[in-house]
Regions:
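Flexible loop/turn segments at secondary-structure boundaries
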Residues: 33-35, 174-175, 186, 196
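Extended, hydrophilic extramembrane loops/domains of integral membrane proteins
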Residues: 162-191
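Bilayer-spanning, highly hydrophobic alpha-helical transmembrane segments
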Residues: 202-209
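Juxtamembrane/start-of-transmembrane alpha-helix segments at the extracytoplasmic/lumenal side
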Residues: 190-202
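Charged, low-complexity helical/coil segments in non-catalytic cytosolic or luminal regions
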Residues: 1-170
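Short coil/turn linker and secondary-structure boundary residues
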Residues: 7-11, 180, 193
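Juxtamembrane boundary at the C-terminal end of a transmembrane helix
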Residues: 211-217
Length: 217
């Protein structure tokens, strides 16, 4: 259904299902500092020679930031790469959990607890702080990290069920998996897709699965 017409005769959609995927959402305050080596280079010609001058600088950066609702899926059944790639969700649309939203859709219970998932959230936050510190250094030919110190203080965690559409398809004898954000329609997968087909299909099924279910902890 989602593949371009050229692929239609060579693939078979095995399954499409709507799933409420368990997620842990982490809030935290983070601070970071780093020491970086930056260089600038300039060249000029002197007779038959080209002389290049490289200058080295020690650059220090420090900053703080706040993370709200960093999501980590708590189901080993779901591929982490797909779940990360279909972000973000609009948490302003959260609704208190109610079984009234579940008929017709699968709802997984987490099999990875908050402590296990916090390790992934921690890595994501650290990488984000590190990237922001490095990105703040501009105007140099090159920048390399000498040392960084990043501290993360967790302030809250939340448990939520977030809507995902999963599509399993077979093409040329191989199985492929697509995932779609059930709120925004963002689609990730391995094969080329016809975005017009995706948009048309999503328009028909998105409304009943746009509920984000939150558990108060």
């Amino acid at each position: 259904r989602f593949l371009p017409n050229a692929f239609s005769s060579q693939n078979h959609i095995e399954e499409i299902k709507g799933v409420y995927v368990p997620f842990w959402l982490f809030d935290a305050n983070a601070s970071g500092s780093g020491l970086y080596e930056a260089t600038t280079s300039s060249s000029h010609r002197n007779g038959d020679y080209v002389i290049t001058t490289t200058r080295h600088y020690d650059v220090r950066r420090a900053g703080t930031t706040q993370f709200m609702g960093v999501p980590v899926d708590g189901s080993t059944k779901m591929p982490n790469g797909h779940m990360d790639a279909i972000e973000p969700y609009d948490y302003r649309a959260f609704q208190p959990f109610s079984t009234a939203y579940l008929p017709g859709y699968m709802a997984d219970k987490y099999d990875e607890d908050a402590d296990t998932c916090q390790a992934r959230a921690h890595s994501r936050m650290q990488n984000s702080v590190s990237s922001e510190l490095s990105a703040s250094i501009t105007g140099y030919s090159s920048v390399s990290t000498l040392s960084e110190n990043i501290s993360i203080d967790y302030t809250a965690k939340h448990y939520a069920l977030l809507p995902v559409w999963m599509l399993h398809t077979k093409w040329q004898g191989k199985d492929y998996l697509f995932a779609m954000n059930g709120q925004t329609g963002k689609l990730v997968g391995d094969l080329p897709v016809d975005k017009r087909k995706v948009a048309a299909w999503f328009a028909g099924i998105s409304v009943p699965l746009m509920i984000l279910l939150a558990f108060l902890l």
